[in-house]
Amino acid sequence: MLDARYLRENLETVEARLKTRGAGVDLERFRQLDGSRRELLQQTETLKALRNKVSDEISRIKDKSQAQDRIIEMREVSQRIKGLDEELKGVEEALEYFLLTVPNIPCAATPVGASEVDNVEVKKWGEKPVFDFAPKPHWEIGESLDILDFERGAKLAGARFTLYKGFGARLERALINFMLDLHTERHKYLEMLPPFMVNRESMTGTGQLPKFEEDLFHMEGVDYFLIPTAEVPVTNIHRGEILKAADLPLCYTAYTPCFRKEAGSYGKDTRGLIRQHQFNKVELVKFVHPAHSYNELDKLLDNAEEVLRLLGLPYRVVDLCTADIGFSAARTYDIEVWLPGQDCYREISSCSNFEDFQARRASIRFREDEKAKPEFVHTLNGSGLAVGRTLVAILENYQEADGSVSIPGALRPYMGGIEKIA
């Protein structure tokens, strides 16, 4: 959420910055609501001051019969105040809802662009594998090795669901454990295991609500949502809290399944694991001091990249342009892994700095010391990594001519020493 005061004082600047997102934000609506709110507040305060003054005068009159006209007048003033308070409440609710639908302002360093074609590649790592045969896509490899069953997944739940079998299930589990061990033991994140369902306040805190409710799985009969990412419950761990500056940064990692409707992806990635309604992910979340948030973003990005480096998977990092960053983000780097079976790079992680946007929505603050005024923290998060897509990358990059798949060395201890799936 943007700061209403900052928006009021920098309306033209904010409007210009939001236009670079391609976001149609009606800031005239803000002017109207904010103006109405301030006018109603002034009227209410004036009447309350009058009521207090006259009430004091009445209290000094010994013969109350001489004050009946003033008493009747103040009753009328009280009714007017009550009506103004009710009107003010409605305006404030409308203003808050409006602010909840306004996206974050891109940071000054975010590349300006009109679409994903304007994203900027900032680095590459690793050599693409060279095959002496035509590399297959992961869905063919998974089916031929009998480790992925798309047909039965669809039978069980419908389109965009997959049944992992045997070494497929074991490889998925191995990747989860490998990622969590790396982030907790080497990168020093604290592991969390949050609920996989959250309430409306949590979804609002991270920015999924109120604007994107149609993309979420909502539980009928109870106001719970299946989480689209661990970012939601983990960020909301400190909702409504005031942290100590000395404790920052707080770095958390969590494995969860994620649930997404993929409402806008009809006809896209209909085969394989790339776009599923349910998938596993290991998430990285940081609560940081505003002065250090972009340094912490660089560290978080490197932590996510290290998963791919240790697995020997070629990748590139892309700085997303203003039109491609998410609703809550001020800056985002995507990590894209090379998939030879599809002859392209595909996103496997998004690492974002939200600055104080989520913290303001969720009221997550910190104090420099006991006497200091609370300030909003900056929140960061990134995938470390999307597990299913990492499995996809292993199947496609480590496939052999005979149809088998080699296991990356770093993963073999998690696979009971198995070197190859055949």
From Swiss-Prot:
The keyword Lyase does not apply. GO terms for molecular function: ATP binding; serine-tRNA ligase activity. Its EC number is 6.1.1.11. It holds the Pfam family Seryl_tRNA_N. It catalyses: tRNA(Ser) + L-serine + ATP = L-seryl-tRNA(Ser) + AMP + diphosphate + H(+); tRNA(Sec) + L-serine + ATP = L-seryl-tRNA(Sec) + AMP + diphosphate + H(+). The keyword Nucleotide-binding applies. Keywords: Aminoacyl-tRNA synthetase, ATP-binding, Cytoplasm, Ligase, Nucleotide-binding, Protein biosynthesis. L-serine binds at T229, A230, E231, E283, S383. PROSITE patterns: AA_TRNA_LIGASE_II. It is an enzyme of class 6 (ligase). ATP binds at R260, K261, E262, E347, I348, S349, S350. GO terms for cellular component: cytoplasm. Its main location: cytoplasm. It is found in: Cytoplasm. Pathway: Aminoacyl-tRNA biosynthesis; selenocysteinyl-tRNA(Sec) biosynthesis; L-seryl-tRNA(Sec) from L-serine and tRNA(Sec): step 1/1. HAMAP family: Ser_tRNA_synth_type1. NCBIfam families: serS. Consists of two distinct domains, a catalytic core and a N-terminal extension that is involved in tRNA binding. Belongs to the class-II aminoacyl-tRNA synthetase family. Type-1 seryl-tRNA synthetase subfamily. Catalyzes the attachment of serine to tRNA(Ser). Is also able to aminoacylate tRNA(Sec) with serine, to form the misacylated tRNA L-seryl-tRNA(Sec), which will be further converted into selenocysteinyl-tRNA(Sec). This is Serine--tRNA ligase. It comes from Geotalea uraniireducens (strain Rf4) (Geobacter uraniireducens).
